[in-house]
């Protein structure tokens, strides 16, 4: 607890220095506009309050654009079928552009008369070679056919367990383990993204995500004291999976990112959105990517 308080104090101290540099003698205002608050759901507003209390310098990132995932107007009850379609979309979009993924999904929808097939229908259709051939013609590789069938089997055979699993709270690791163990093509990263966009879990953090790594590099670039403290207090080193890549920004190891993110717990999912925005150099492209993430 003592160490966490020290990190919190360093984050806030570095933030105050940065704000003072930019604002000079102008007063600091970190209260989100009432209209902004009214449009977002309560748990997101609570997250913003917590994050700004920890680091006021993040105010502009939060204020400048709405967060589609947390808008009241986008909140609808999700069914087991909705979860299946979201995970199926994740599989379809792997290793290809968003536009290509949308095109493939649209062809699947067209094949099934205007709606994405539910898991029970796909479970039966994967037993029929002729139907499998029709699905594959929509643009699915052999590997993605295997992945999609695996997902349909998982939902069909374990739907009662899944309903219970997805309906519980504070079981993020259990959800990740179940998806990764039972569904071919769903790894830890995909499972974490589903926790955020599908189950709306608020305390997820994925240091292995390239955008998060880039945003974190920018975030820490003006916090020298915090960086020194994080480096000094390392106990267990968890190497970044993207460490070997050549980028023009510094890549931090996973343990450094995770330790820093703990300051913003239990709202690290929102902190991830902030880091994604910090990583972007094109606001319009960033907002479009967020919208696609919410829909996928």
From Swiss-Prot:
Belongs to the alkylbase DNA glycosidase AlkA family. This is DNA-3-methyladenine glycosylase. It is an enzyme of class 3 (hydrolase). Keywords: DNA damage, DNA repair, Hydrolase, Nucleus, Phosphoprotein. GO terms for biological process: base-excision repair, AP site formation; DNA alkylation repair. It is found in: Nucleus. The record marks 189 as: Determinant for substrate specificity and/or activity. The active site is at 209 (proton acceptor). The modification Phosphoserine is found at residue 110. Hydrolysis of the deoxyribose N-glycosidic bond to excise 3-methyladenine or 7-methyladenine from the damaged DNA polymer formed by alkylation lesions. GO terms for molecular function: alkylated DNA binding; alkylbase DNA N-glycosylase activity; damaged DNA binding; DNA-3-methyladenine glycosylase activity; DNA-7-methylguanine glycosylase activity. It catalyses: Hydrolysis of alkylated DNA, releasing 3-methyladenine, 3-methylguanine, 7-methylguanine and 7-methyladenine. SMART domains: ENDO3c (SM00478). The keyword Transferase does not apply. Its EC number is 3.2.2.21. Signal peptide: none annotated. GO terms for cellular component: nucleus; protein-DNA complex. The keyword Phosphoprotein applies. It holds the Pfam family HhH-GPD. Its main location: nucleus. PROSITE patterns: ALKYLBASE_DNA_GLYCOS (PS00516). Induction: By DNA damage.
């Amino acid at each position: 607890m003592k160490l966490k308080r020290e990190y919190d104090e360093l984050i806030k101290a570095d933030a105050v220095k940065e704000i003072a540099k930019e604002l000079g003698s102008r007063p600091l205002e970190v209260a989100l506009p009432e209209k902004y608050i009214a449009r977002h759901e309560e748990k997101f507003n609570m997250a913003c309050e917590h994050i700004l209390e920890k680091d006021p310098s993040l105010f502009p990132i939060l204020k400048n654009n709405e967060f589609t995932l947390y808008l009241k107007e986008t909140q609808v009850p999700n069914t087991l079928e909705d979860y299946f379609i979201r995970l199926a979309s994740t599989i379809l979009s792997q290793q290809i552009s968003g536009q290509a993924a949308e095109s493939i999904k649209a062809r699947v929808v067209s094949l099934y008369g205007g709606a994405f097939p539910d898991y029970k229908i796909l479970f039966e259709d994967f037993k029929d070679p002729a139907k499998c051939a029709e699905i594959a013609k929509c643009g699915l590789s052999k590997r993605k056919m295997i992945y999609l069938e695996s997902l349909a089997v998982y939902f069909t055979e374990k739907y009662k367990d899944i309903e219970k699993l997805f309906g519980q709270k504070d079981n993020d690791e259990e959800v990740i383990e179940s998806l990764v163990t039972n569904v071919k093509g769903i790894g830890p990263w995909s499972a974490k993204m589903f926790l955020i966009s599908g189950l709306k879990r608020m305390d997820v953090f994925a240091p292995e995500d390239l955008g998060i790594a880039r945003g974190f590099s920018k975030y820490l670039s003006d916090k020298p004291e915090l960086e020194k403290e994080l480096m000094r207090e390392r106990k267990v080193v968890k190497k970044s999976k993207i460490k070997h890549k050549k980028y023009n920004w510094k890549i931090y190891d996973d343990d450094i990112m995770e330790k820093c993110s703990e300051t913003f717990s239990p709202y690290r999912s929102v902190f991830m959105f902030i880091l994604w925005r910090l990583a972007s150099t094109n606001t319009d492209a960033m907002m479009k990517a967020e919208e696609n993430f919410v829909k996928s």
